[in-house]
Amino acid sequence: WWDGVVAAVRQAMNGLSDVVNIRAIGLSGQMHSLVALDSHDEVIRPAILWNDTRTSEQCREIERRLGSDGLRHLVGNPALEGFTAPKLLWMRDHEPKNYSRIATMLLPKDYVRLKLTGVKAMDPSDAAGTLMFDIAETRWSSAAVAKMEIPETWLPEIVPSNKVSGTLSGEAAAALGLSAGIPVAGGAADNAAAAIGSAVTSPGTAMVSIGTGATVVAPIPNAAVDPGLRLHTFNHAEPDGWYLMGVVLAAGSALAWWRDQTGGGQSFDELVVGAAETAPGADDLTFLPYLTGNRTPHANASARGAFVGLHAGHTRAHMTRAVIEGVTFSLHDSYQLILAQTEAPTELIGTSGGMRSAFWQQMVADVFGVPLTPVKSSGSPYGAAILAACAAGKFDRPSEVAPQWVTRGKTADPIPAHAD
């Protein structure tokens, strides 16, 4: 990751005539993934990523230790395989020597922060996805980590997303070709940053992001937790904000899998052309996109994908459309639960790879029954930049500037006939 940061920053600097005007650095990264460090801040083992589902046994242990009330009231989320705490317990059970060496637990963007500044810190939006954070009080949950017997000393300082977490060290500045002392913002988890970068900062707005996985995010006014723990409640990068989130683990990756299994060689745009020419419903063919399990709303890591209703008349185009529809309807399952807990948005904001497709934009609008407007910028990086501007003192809250800075594309209105 650090090598990638160095290469990317130096490449970006090649296109700038005056690097001294860089006022701050923003951070964003994938949620949940465990970076375990020893007492010398050296990485102990390769990171265990967010979509790794090896921790089912540890999740059941956490459920026993915390109970459903503890999960709701201490950490505000279900014990799911992708979260960070189960990964620590997996290391305890399967890599005891590595586990005994842990001195600090970080997430991906926070490891990059450490390399940039020498500071070990995490923002609330990422901490919320560890299963060790009190989302209502915006602090580590001493009670939860005690019940899981995870040392609280491993947990880094919490810093606000929109404030300075540290400054660029001389060593990092030399590696990047920048000036030492540049402020580094607290930053945000990828979905929280994408919401900031899409101007989805307050209740009544919602965002659909489709990349490797897919998410639907809806800001809420308080730390309300789904009674059935079928959704996530996370801290927003907007100060004193929270959001509900539903997740499809295999979204763009399901389409990539389908392309690769049928010969590959086509770009996603080429693959989608045939699907777009096929009528909605894919001739009664249904695809279940559970290639890596289901996260919300069913929380079943053992769930598996399937084509249902396949007959000899179905073509590759039908099956491609079924894959895209399956991802969209799976995400809609979570959206229906969100609507039961917060006000319905008047429009959806689309971001990330899948939402660059006009075909997929229209499908989301049709299935959700809400107009969808894509943003032209890349949500997470743009959100990180807005948070950097706040850390530099240009603004106080992301919501002050995001609506003015975010450029929107053409709105896709629902076509009722497509949903029938």
Residue ranges and their predicted role:
Residues 13, 63, 72, 92, ...:
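Residue-level preference for well-ordered alpha-helical positions
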